[in-house]
Amino acid sequence: MKLLGAPASPFARKVRVLALELGLDLPLETVATATSVELPLANPLAKIPTLLRDDGPPIYDSPVICDYLNALAGGALVPASGEARWRALTLEALADGLCDAAVWRRGEMLRPEVEQNAAALAKQAAVVERALDALEAQVETFTSFGVGEIAAACAVAYLDFRFAAEPWRPTRPKLAAGYARVSERASMKATTPD
């Protein structure tokens, strides 16, 4: 079993952190989405992360991979049912949406400035701000470290990595404190991108 992804991808990092927390060995094979021959054969969407299994067809996207790995390991990082499951998956969706907006912004900002869509950049920046505010409002979730908290930690870590000039901590002290605690976990340290 191996994960096709990139060290800087917050979605691949979420999967890698979850795998480490579950005690699973999940090698990362770094692929370039634009040029990889293997990726579109495994995932017709040609998106990362994609999980290549030894005993079945590939699995994608990151929420499905996390659910699969949790089931494979008999873990409790993705609750099986009830309100706890819906809360965890909703928190994961919030963090993933933040990442979607941030990754899109990063790609757009790599284009020549005259070709950038300023209105779309502003819209996605607003999505990030609203998501951060929502995380601040529910930061008590960092008292545990399940799939939702892992996704949230990887999302704000991505902002630190790609948008260091846009500090999010000053107006979100509870989120900052919660993230400071979980960022010390071995799984987070082992997956920090260069």
Whereabouts are the PLM-identified features?
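GST-like domain detector, emphasizing the conserved glutathione-binding G-site
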Residues: 1-119
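Hydrophobic/aromatic-lined pockets within catalytic cores
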Residues: 70-74, 160, 164, 183, ...
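Charged/polar, low-hydrophobicity segments characteristic of intrinsically disordered regions
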Residues: 137, 182-194
